[in-house]
């Protein structure tokens, strides 16, 4: 299967930056934000700059520029966001070869996650911003935690 990279044509993202922000950059007039549920160790690795790809079995249909990060239990809070540099779609073996150096997961975990799938997706992470104060998802956004993602 041929691989593809979906570039974000609206914004060029330079080197990753780690900033702290008191409020999210959410602009509801533009449907360019998605909320992702991410397990605590993977979310922490993203904010430390160790994990540069977020893997998904299903991907957005709309263009997404910013991912709002909801850390799952036991934290259960929105803690920050990151810019989407691109989305890579490829067969699972090729996807691992292309992303493994900054995957933030070992090969066993990667292939277990994609078991039974031919194609996988990797969201290339650009600049990251951790909020000064985590936000309660339902109180702040009026939604419940998504199984995978939802558009904001």
Segments and roles (model prediction):
Residues 2-152:
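Structured alpha/beta reader/binder surfaces that contact nucleic acids or chromatin modification marks
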